[in-house]
Structures are given as C-alpha cells and as structure tokens.
C-alpha cells in the first residue's frame, strides 16, 4: 500500500525540475494453474489453483497485486447416510499412537477458540490436544453450519454451497428467499406461579425452522428439551449439562449457557426443520424473568390426521468396519404420540441404517502381560513378564504378530525388572542388662525386636524365618557367702499382667530349708514376689512377655485349703506343703507358666481339691547338696536330674537334641517332630505312647509318697513348658500326654486327660485353647504354644465339655449334697473342708447306692470271678480313669490306710456294662461309637455289627479304638459289639437306633432296658456325635433335656433372583428333635426346597415368589418350639396387572392397575409422554399406584404409561386406553326375534373371554353366545 501511495507522486513532475525520470518496476502474474483435486469426496470440499509472480526485484520480494491462490467449492452434494464426520476422520488418524506413555482413541473437540485447528479429545478423558495447526480444507467450522475452514481460517459458504457466496437462507430455509413461504410464531413465557422443578413452556411443532429460545435475563433456571414420549434430549432427570451442540429431531440443537459459576441467560437455537415435536421446559428454581421464543412454520397447512414423526439418528455402533444407527419413529397428531397403527396408511420411515462402512485402520503396538511373582520377598529380587507385538483392526479384533512388525515402534516395555528391594527383616538384640545377682549364678536379660528397613519396628512374624536370639542367659559371679537369703527358694518371674503402661508380675518365694516356721525369723530378707513391669508407654513394645488378665490380683495369690489328712505317718509334714504349694488352691486361672493367663471366667472350687503329693523340697536341703543345686537354678534341672539347664526347653542339656528343636520330640522322646501336634511322627507305637514306659495308671486315691517320684520334678513354671506338661501336683513333669509316670491321680470321675493341668508346651506359636478344670467341672481358656503339651487340650469350650463332662450321664457337674459333701468309693471320700476320709471297711461285694443329688449314681458290676475283687465304678466314669491293677477297696488293709501301689503284669479289660447301650441318631449325621475297654498294648479293639465284621468306606476305626460312621444310613441300625482281639475277653454292645422323620420316642419301659444314651446336644457342632461310655441301666431314668431353638440365628435373609440360599434352624434337646419348615401354615415341599440333615432349608434358584415368612418348627415328641425367618428377594423391578389395551365406555370409570414388585418404589403415570396429574376430581392416583379416571371422555383416550422408580432402577409399562361411545338406548326386543350372533360386527369369542356380556352394547352383537354364558358380576373397566 505504501508503494501505491507513492506512485502518483512519481508521475507528476515538479515544474522546472531537472531531476531524472525514475523507471517503474514491472512485476506481473503468470498464468493460473489447473484446479487441484477436491479436498473431500462429498459434503462440500475445497479446490484451489495457484499462479506465479514474475518479479525483477533483487531483494526476493514481489510487487504483484492480488492473491497467489484462489479457492472454490467442489463436491457439494450431501454424503450418504451414516457417513463419518470429516473432522472425526482426521482425529482418528492418531488412534493407537503413543501419547505421553499411553495410547488413546481420539474424538473431535469443537469448543476450542480457534475453530479451524485440529483439536481432539481422548475418549474417556477430560482434556483435548491440538494435533495440527489447521484442519483439512473443507472441514466445517462448527457442526450444523455451512462455513468451512480454508488455509486455517473460517470462510463463509452461502446457501448455494459456494465459497464466499453472499446468498443466505431466510427464516423459511429457502436460499435467497424473502421469508414469505413461512410465518413466524413468537411469544414470551412469563408465568411466575411456577412450581419448583420442571414446567412446560411450549411445544415446538414438527417442521419448525429457525428456532430461537432464550431467557430475557440471567437466572438460576435452566431450559430442558424432550420429545412427546417423555424422553429427554437435554437437562433431563435433574442432570444439568454443559453448553454443546446436540442432535435432536433430525437437526442440530445448539445449547448455550454460562460457564460453571457464571450467570448468563440460557439460549437454544436450531436451523430445523424438526422431524418431531419438541417439548420445551423450564427447570424453575427462582422467579421466572421471562423466556422469549420464536420459530417459523411453513404456510402450507400440514395434512390433517395422523403422521409419522421421528427423532435423530443415534451414534454409530461402530467407528469403522460397518455399524448401524437407529432412531425413534412414532405416530403423532396435535403434538401428541399415538399407537403406530394410527399411521398405518402412510409409509413408515426407516428406523435403522448402516454407518461407518469404511474399513478400520490396522495398528500395531506392544502389549505386556502381568508381572510374575518376585523371586525374593525382600533383599532384592527380579520378576519377568511376556512382551509381544499385537495388531488391532480398530473393531476390537486383536492378534499377536511377529515382533519385527513392532520393531520401529518406540517404548518397548521392559520384560524384566527388579523388585522387593527393601531390606529383609532381622532380629535386632539390645545390649545385655545387668546380672540379676551380685554373686553366684544369676540371669541377665535383653530386649530382642524385629526390625525392617531403616530400623523400622515390625511384628515378630516378619522375622519368623530366623531363630530369635535368646532373651536371657545365665551369668556367674563369685560364690556368695552363706547368708540368710539362701533359705528362700525363688522361682522365675511369671508373665506381666499388662503389656504397657502399668503392670505387675509375680514369682514364687518359698522357704527352702523346711516348713514356713523355719523361715519365720528371716522374713526381713524374704525376696519380693511382686514387682512392676511393662511400665513403658503403649506405643512402645513390651519389655517382658505379658498376659491379658482381666481379673484383679488378690492380696494373697496362693489361697490355702484345709489341711490334707495324710495317711498314718508324718501327716504334719504335709501340712506346710499344702499351704505353700501352688497346686493347693481352688483358683485355676493363674497357673504358673501360662504365657497369657487370660482365663475368661473366675472358677471357684466346687468339689474336693486335688490330692497333693509331697514336694521335692519337703526335707530341708543339706550341706551336701551345695548352694548350686539344679533345682534352684533359674531354668531347673535337665532330664538327667542333676545338670542345671541353661535356658528354657532344657537348653544346654546333654543328650536332649529333640527337646531343643522347634517342635520338640515325638512321643518316643527321641525323634524330632516336624511340626505342631507331633507332625511327621510315626503313628504306631505298639500301644506304648511313652517310648517303652508301660501305660499304667496311678491310683486314684492319695498315696503316701516317701520316695522320689519316677518323673522329673520341677518348679510349677517349668513343668508346664515341658514336653508333656505337669503331673497332677503341678510340680513333677509328666512322661506322656495322659499323665504317664505321674502318681496321685485325683479322684474325680472324669477321663484321665481331663484331670491333668494345662500345659502350654515348649513352642511359642501362641493360640487360645481350652482345658478342663476337674475340681470345678468346667472348662477354661489357656494359651497353647503350638507343640507338645498333654491331652487336656481342646479347640473349643464345646469340645472340651463334650469330651470331659459329656461322658457323665448324671449331673453336668459335681453336685453338692445337703452337706456339701462329694461321695466316692475309691477308698476314701472328701469332707467339706477338703480332708480325706478313710474308706469304710466292706466285707461284701454290695455297694450302697447314694441318692441322686449327692454326687452321681453308682452301680455294681457283675459278681467277680474266683479270686477277683468286685469292681465298682462311678456312674459315667471313664474306665481308664482308674488304676486297673490297683487293689480293690475293702480287700485287706486297715481302715483309713490306703493300699500301696500294686502294679499288675496283666491287663484286665473292664466293661461298662453287659446290657447293650442305646444310641439314637438321625439319617445323615455323624456318629462316634466309643469302646470303653482299656486294652493291653498288644490288644486292639475290634468292631462287629450283628455278629459280622464291619467293612465299609463309611465306617472308620480311630486310633483310640472308637468307630465313626458318617453319613448315617438306614442300614446302619443294629447291634454293634466292641471288644479285644485277645481270646477270652468280653465285648461291649451298643444298640444303634435310626430316628426317622416321625421321631421315635422311647417309653419309660424302653428306657429302663437300655443305658441312657449320651445327649447329642452336648456335642453342638458335631451333629449326632454320641458315645455310650459309662451308660448303665438305672432305676432313675435320665430326665430329657428341654427342647431349645437357637434364637440367635438370622431372622432376615436377603437374596437375589437365581441365587442359592440357606436358612438355618439349629435345635437341641433329648430326644433329638425333628425339624420341619412351613410357609403360610403349610409344609414347604418342592424340588427347589430341600431340608438338610442339620435342619436348615436350602432354596435353589430363588424366585421373586419365594419371598415371605418361613417358620421353622422343631418337635421331639414332648416339646415343640418354632421361629420365623423372613426371606426378602431383592430382584429387579417388575410391573404386572396392566394389559396392553383397555377399552372403556365413555362416561364410565377407567381403573388402571400398576402392580410393582419391590419396596420403596415411586410410581408415576403419563399420557402420551406427558405427566398425568391427579386433580382430586376426575383423576385420582391411589397409594398402591392405581390410576382412576372418572367420567371418562373421548379426549382421555391415548397411551398411558406407568413408570416405577427405585433408586437407580426404573421400569415402565404402557397400555392403550380406548374410549367407545355409549350404546344407543336399547329397544324392546321382539320375543319372537331369533337370538343370533353378528360376527360381522364383533368377535364374540373375545367378548366372552373379556366377560363383556354384562355390557349392553357388546352383548347386542352376541346374543346367542351371551345367552349361553351368564356372568357372575358386572365387569370392572381396566
């Protein structure tokens, strides 16, 4: 432009000037080139041509005036239906390409400021990216508009599809028109009394063009758009959308609103024409400022009657390779939807078409599989995975190809990586503390913790693969001078009562030089027996092991019992032992050596105290024993009896390698166990579980022990951690799991295993277990270390009570008599004060029967054979609980003097009874038949049924000689005999009776012929487990346990359709009850309802109709009990009761039922897509969803839809309501006229099926048919 302004000045010479003439440069254009190919094949592309500029300028510029390139429109014809968007095709070129470490599928983004940049958004993400500076020429600037991008700029395209054309469409969409072919419809919706929510503004008719709807002022209200069927296109169901262009009614509807947080007027505009009516609504939240609307309709009147309308095409089902689109096609008139058959005279528009037929691009990429487990859990390892090349065609089909095809792709994932680089956990010992003594042999302690990377504190389980360094070690100083404190025997400290804050721990301090009176003058030097422990804050690890004791410690932990009367000699010598020895106390919750001590219930001694053995320190220590006697060492003696152990579990002892192993010794005391509970040990010991030690039993009465016991004797805290725990006196170490090698067995009528003290074993894998406290007849908890221990060890309280108390068929626990006295016949009784009473001398075999409440029933066996003493046995007593070879009471000896131990070389099998015991059980249960014979080591139990050997997979012989039958079948009923394989031995008989569905109940006469069976309810959890041990005939039949149902079971069961559920019903009682399930008072019986052997009801493939209340009824022939269970079927919503078509005469009442299966359901009715509001006069909606329309009119005809909503679920069902004109007044019929049907006017079969003969209008066409059919009542219009 600067040059153009200067040119005139150069052409006008100044007057009188002699300046030389300047020569003008001549830059010219060359010829135009050919037109380039069109940028698109359809839909309006752009072609261009270019021309060169010939210039003589030496600076590289040109002075040619005009454009060097010109453009024109081409291929303006519309693309075929279903063709892909042109901008979307350009974004799809980047599909599968790596972008910031990921691969995306890209879609076009239209809301960027520069409309001609190629901005794309990844599918499923919320950001867009500019892939190119400019889109391909001919790409529309915005969807729904004709303007296109050329060289990165938006250029105008006229309605004649020509580039830079000035021709525009008028409001009627005529190119270059003057707007005379249509008429405008405009107005303002300014109603102010709007309810909160959706309010209809207007309905834009089908065929409308140049639509504009906007708010008069900004507000917090929103516009919404839906079709006449109630389906929302914009802002439906209280979901407000962002500004966008959306397809609706075969046009593009542009929605404009302020950004999030900005307040701007709502605006809608569309080109049209619309292919269906659009309902415009205002979501009102504040006063309406007014909404302006304007649209145009063609001057030609639409054809009257019904016509087809259709919505916009849906998105293509596939992005390439061929997909399909669908749209809604429906019949309308007067902006309302009607059934399709109303438009059947007109051709129906297509509702489905193909789309995106172009082939999918093939892409290749690397794909990696999952990582394999790391080769090391810590300290650095490696893991690998498979990496391979896959080829994808974009349609979801992938296949693996050669890696060479992906060789050029960047970023191949690694196939190997390092893992678990953190440092392994290891034990971290603290420095040793000071020695516990200043002279002599003491102990020093230290703390050992499990530490991880950077010294972080970890749980001890993280270091379980390594042996934990010892927490204590002996320390030796110079010999101490003989001081008064040597008179005290000091035990090891017990567990701390708390793990942090403030705890206490105890130890045993007793006089070591004789009775307590010998130490009376040395009380000032008595070491403390209680000290604080674990005083650190609770966020720090505990300093010493602790227990969780919920009881407050008593001021005197050792509660002395009354004096034990000792036999004959030196009875006073045992008096002080009974006072000091910890086993002479009734409280068993704090036994020494228990690592936790959390005995859940405080048990008080209800029966006689266990008999006491003379402690090893009864006699004063002599100078010959020296000050370093192993019994006074911190960890007691080694198994040899004289070497001091250097640590727990006989550490440092000679010849005890298996004791020092992790899981200790096998029962042979030589082999090393490979795991808890003697894992890896041989099961066969020839009946000798003590490695050659005979399985003899100790006498049940108190024995005067004047010699050293056979078993090792330790302090109470030590023997519980030995291989088989303590003997009955809590001091001596047992030689076997059933108290082998122990003397002084208590006289309680319980199995031997139930008389032993709890033993936590020698390992440290602590777990809560149960043991039986014979002195009170109850079970209590204790902490078990995971290996070794004795047989008084049970997994649950029920198992404990079943194994110990379950063997008694008298009272459940020792019952005190009128004087609180418990009576026994094993040579002595027990006085209320705990003193042993001398047995009365008996001259005959008869034994006096005691009353029932005084401690149990007694019986006498058959008369003994020649030279054999009569054998008496307590009611319910286990036969092996007594010394089989012991001397019988009443045979020789002075009264009040117990017989000395008598070990017989032969083993006599004692029988529980000659008459058969009775066991009752139901089909499918598990039954254990126990043999009460105490067989010799070389003898084995043999079982027979009805005299024949037993051979079946359901019959399994156990190690203890018992027989398990599972599952129980009808043919298992009969008489079972158990006996020894040795000749000349008697057998025990057990009568097994099968209880059927009618529940057989024994009469009192039948009960008197059989010993009472064990109550199956005592073995709760092991259905049908019963045993006849100790069952005897009695004149006092066992009272039946009252029937009881477990009311703690779930009362509400939720299920989904098709699910399999179980409803439990646990009952117990005697006789065992029968279970029946009922529903609505009737037994439940169907192939899908199955009653299980344990009483539960299993329902397969639950259906909606299964929901309701079920009753479990238990009956045992005497008592009855029941409980109900509600089954709730949480299925999908369903609507029933609404037929497809309802015909109602004009003026009658339409009753539309909408029965919805489900709870908390909201029901809404609509007619032709518009909500039906109850007005309280003609239209009513009942709470159950029924719609009532009184005085029906012709304008009420239409499609009624019932919609049910429950949470996120929704379901709807429609019915067509047809209104028929009332029949004319019926004329008196000619009696002589024939009564015939008129099939050309009505289908009489349908009228009969619908029971419409009561309607005079319909019955007039079907006289003959209705005469043969007399309706019972007037039909209800539905």
From Swiss-Prot:
Q: Locations of Basic and acidic residues compositional bias?
A: 582-599
One Pfam family it belongs to: TSP_1
Annotated disulfide bonds: 38-74, 42-79, 53-64, 316-355, 320-360, 331-343, 754-804, 763-787, 779-800, 931-978, 1065-1112, 1154-1202
Record-linked InterPro entries: ADAMTS/ADAMTS-like, ADAMTS_ADAMTS-like, ADAMTS_CR_3, ADAMTS_spacer1, Ig-like_dom, Ig-like_dom_sf, Ig-like_fold, Ig_I-set
Start and end residues of each TSP type-1 domain: 26-80, 304-361, 362-421, 423-481, 484-539
Q: Name one GO biological process term.
A: extracellular matrix organization
Q: Which UniProt keywords apply?
A: Disulfide bond, Immunoglobulin domain, Protease inhibitor, Repeat, Secreted, Serine protease inhibitor, Signal
GO CC terms on record? extracellular region
Locate the PLAC domain: which residues? 1231-1270
Annotated signal sequence range:
1-18
**Please, which domain of life does this record's source organism belong to?**
Eukaryota
Indicate, by first and last residue, each region the UniProt record lists as having compositional bias (Low complexity).
608-620
Indicate the segments forming the Ig-like C2-type domain, all copies. 900-995, 1033-1128, 1133-1218
Q: Where is the BPTI/Kunitz inhibitor domain?
A: 754-804
Disordered, as annotated region: 544-632, 805-901, 1014-1042
Please provide, alphabetically and separated by semicolons, the GO molecular function terms listed in this UniProt record. serine-type endopeptidase inhibitor activity
Where is this gene product found? Secreted
| The keyword Signal belongs to this UniProt entry's keyword annotation | yes
The family classification in the record reads:
Belongs to the papilin family.
Q: What is this protein called?
A: Papilin
């Amino acid at each position: 432009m600067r040059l153009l302004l200067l040119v005139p000045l150069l052409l006008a010479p100044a007057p009188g000037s002699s300046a030389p003439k300047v020569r003008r440069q001549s830059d010219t254009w060359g010829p135009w080139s050919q037109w380039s190919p069109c940028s698109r094949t359809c839909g309006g592309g752009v072609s261009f041509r270019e021309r060169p500029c010939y210039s003589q300028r030496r600076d590289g510029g040109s002075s040619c005036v005009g454009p060097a390139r010109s453009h024109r429109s081409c291929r303006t014809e519309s693309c075929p239906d279903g063709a892909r968007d042109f901008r979307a095709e350009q974004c799809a070129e980047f599909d599968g390409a790596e972008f910031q470490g990921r691969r995306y599928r890209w879609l076009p983004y239209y809301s960027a400021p520069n409309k001609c940049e190629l901005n794309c958004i990844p599918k499923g993400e919320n950001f867009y990216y500019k892939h190119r500076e400019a889109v391909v020429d001919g790409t529309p600037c915005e969807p729904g508009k004709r303007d296109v991008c050329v060289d990165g700029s938006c250029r105008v395209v006229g309605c004649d599809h020509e580039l830079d054309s000035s021709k525009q469409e008028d409001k009627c969409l005529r190119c270059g028109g003057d707007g005379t072919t249509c008429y405008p419809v405009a107005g303002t919706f300014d109603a102010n009394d709007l309810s909160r929510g959706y309010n209809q503004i207007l309905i834009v008719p089908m065929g409308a063009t140049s639509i504009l709807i906007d708010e008069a002022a900004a507000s917090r209200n929103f516009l919404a758009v839906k079709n006449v069927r109630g389906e929302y296109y914009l802002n439906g169901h209280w979901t407000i959308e962002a500004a966008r262009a959306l397809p609706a009614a075969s046009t593009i509807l542009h929605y404009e609103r302020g950004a999030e947080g900005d307040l701007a007027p709502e605006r809608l505009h569309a080109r049209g024409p619309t292919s269906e009516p659009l309902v415009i609504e205002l979501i009102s939240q504040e006063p309406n400022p007014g909404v302006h609307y304007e649209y145009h309709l063609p001057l030609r009147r639409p054809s009257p009657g019904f016509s087809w309308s259709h919505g916009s095409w849906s998105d293509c089902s596939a992005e390439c390779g061929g997909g399909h689109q669908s749209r809604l096609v429906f019949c309308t008139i007067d902006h309302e939807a009607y059934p399709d058959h109303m438009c059947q005279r007109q051709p129906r528009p297509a509702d489905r078409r193909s789309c995106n037929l172009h082939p999918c691009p093939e892409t290749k990429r690397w794909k990696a599989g999952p990582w394999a487990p790391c080769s090391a859990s810590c300290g650095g390892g490696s893991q690998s995975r498979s990496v391979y090349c896959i080829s994808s065609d974009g349609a979801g089909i992938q296949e693996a190809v050669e890696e060479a095809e992906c060789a050029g792709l960047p970023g191949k994932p690694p196939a190997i990586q390092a893992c678990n680089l953190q440092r392994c956990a290891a034990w971290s010992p603290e420095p040793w503390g000071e020695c516990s003594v200043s002279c002599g042999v003491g102990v020093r302690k230290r703390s050992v913790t499990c530490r991880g990377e950077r010294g972080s504190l970890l749980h001890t389980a993280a270091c379980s693969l390594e042996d934990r360094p010892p927490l204590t070690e002996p320390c030796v100083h110079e010999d101490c001078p003989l001081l008064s404190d040597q008179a005290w025997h000091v035990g090891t400290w017990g567990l701390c009562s708390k793990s942090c804050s403030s705890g206490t721990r105890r130890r045993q301090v007793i006089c070591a030089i004789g009775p307590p009176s010998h130490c009376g003058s040395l009380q000032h030097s008595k070491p403390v027996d209680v000290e604080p422990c674990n005083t650190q804050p609770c966020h720090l690890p505990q300093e010493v092991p602790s227990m969780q004791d919920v009881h407050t410690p008593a001021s005197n932990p050792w509660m002395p019992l009354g004096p034990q009367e000792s036999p004959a000699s030196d009875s006073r010598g045992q008096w002080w032992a009974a006072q000091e020895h910890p086993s002479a106390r009734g409280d068993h919750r704090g036994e020494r050596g228990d690592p936790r001590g959390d005995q859940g219930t405080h048990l008080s001694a209800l029966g006689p105290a266990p008999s006491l053995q003379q402690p090893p320190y009864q006699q004063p220590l002599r100078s010959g024993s020296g000050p370093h006697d192993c019994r006074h060492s911190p960890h007691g003696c080694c198994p040899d009896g004289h070497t001091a152990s250097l640590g727990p579990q006989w550490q440092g002892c000679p010849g005890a390698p298996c004791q020092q192993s992790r899981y200790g010794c096998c029962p042979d005391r030589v082999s090393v166990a490979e795991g808890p509970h003697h894992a890896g040990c041989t099961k066969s010991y020839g009946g000798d579980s003590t490695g050659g030690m005979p399985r003899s039993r100790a006498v049940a009465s108190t024995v005067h022990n004047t010699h050293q016991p056979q078993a090792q004797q330790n302090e109470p805290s030590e023997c519980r951690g030995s291989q088989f725990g303590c003997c009955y006196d809590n001091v001596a170490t047992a030689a076997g799991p059933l108290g082998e090698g122990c003397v002084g067995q208590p006289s309680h009528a319980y199995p031997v295993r139930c008389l032993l003290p709890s033993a936590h074993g020698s390992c440290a894998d602590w777990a809560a277990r149960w043991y039986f406290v014979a002195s009170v007849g109850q079970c209590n908890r204790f902490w078990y270390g995971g290996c070794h221990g004795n047989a008084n060890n049970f997994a649950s309280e029920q198992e404990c009570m079943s194994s110990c108390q379950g063997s008694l068929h008298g009272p459940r626990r020792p019952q005190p008599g009128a004087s609180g006295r418990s009576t026994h016949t094993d040579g002595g009784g027990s006085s209320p004060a705990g003193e042993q009473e001398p047995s009365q001398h008996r001259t005959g075999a008869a034994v006096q029967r005691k009353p029932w409440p005084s401690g149990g029933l007694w019986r006498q066996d058959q008369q003994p054979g020649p030279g054999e003493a009569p054998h008496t046995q307590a009611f319910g007593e286990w036969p092996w609980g007594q010394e089989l070879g012991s001397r019988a009471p009443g045979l020789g000896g002075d009264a009040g003097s117990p017989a000395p131990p008598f070990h017989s070389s032969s083993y006599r099998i004692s029988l529980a009874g000659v008459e058969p015991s009775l066991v009752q059980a139901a089909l499918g249960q598990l039954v254990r038949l126990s043999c009460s014979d105490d067989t010799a080591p070389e003898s084995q139990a043999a079982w027979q049924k009805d005299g024949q050997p037993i051979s079946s997979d359901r019959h399994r012989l156990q190690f203890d000689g018992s027989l398990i039958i599972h599952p129980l079948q009808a043919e298992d009923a009969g008489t079972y005999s158990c006996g020894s394989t040795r000749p000349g031995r008697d057998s025990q008989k057990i009568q097994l009776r099968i209880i059927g569905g009618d529940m057989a109940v024994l009469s009192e006469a039948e009960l008197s012929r059989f010993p009472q069976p064990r109550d199956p309810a005592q073995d709760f959890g092991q259905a049908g487990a019963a045993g006849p041990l100790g069952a005897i005939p009695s004149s006092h039949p066992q009272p039946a346990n009252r029937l009881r149902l477990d009311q703690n079971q779930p009362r509400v069961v939720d299920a989904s359709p098709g699910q399999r559920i179980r409803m439990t019903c646990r009952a117990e009682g005697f006789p065992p009850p029968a279970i029946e399930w009922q529903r609505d008072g009737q037994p439940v019986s169907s192939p899908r309802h199955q009653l299980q052997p344990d009483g539960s009801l299993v329902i397969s493939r639950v259906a909606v109709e299964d929901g309701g209340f079920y009753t479990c009824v238990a009956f045992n022939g005497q008592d009855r009990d029941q409980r109900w269970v509600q089954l709730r079927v949480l299925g999908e919503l369903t609507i029933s009761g609404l037929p497809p078509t309802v015909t109602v005469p004009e003026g009658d009442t339409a009753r539309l039922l909408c029965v919805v299966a489900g709870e908390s359901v909201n029901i809404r009715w609509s007619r032709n897509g518009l909500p039906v509001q109850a007005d309280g006069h003609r239209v009513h909606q009942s709470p159950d969803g029924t719609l009532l329309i009184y005085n029906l009119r012709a304008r009420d005809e239409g499609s009624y839809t019932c919609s049910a909503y429950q949470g996120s679920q929704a379901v709807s069902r429609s019915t067509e309501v047809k209104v028929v004109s009332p029949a004319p007044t019926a004329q008196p019929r000619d009696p002589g006229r024939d009564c015939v049907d008129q099939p050309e006017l009505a289908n009489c079969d349908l009228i009969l099926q619908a029971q419409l003969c009561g309607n005079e209008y319909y019955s007039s066409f079907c006289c003959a048919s209705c005469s043969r059919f007399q309706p019972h009542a007037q039909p209800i219009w539905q």
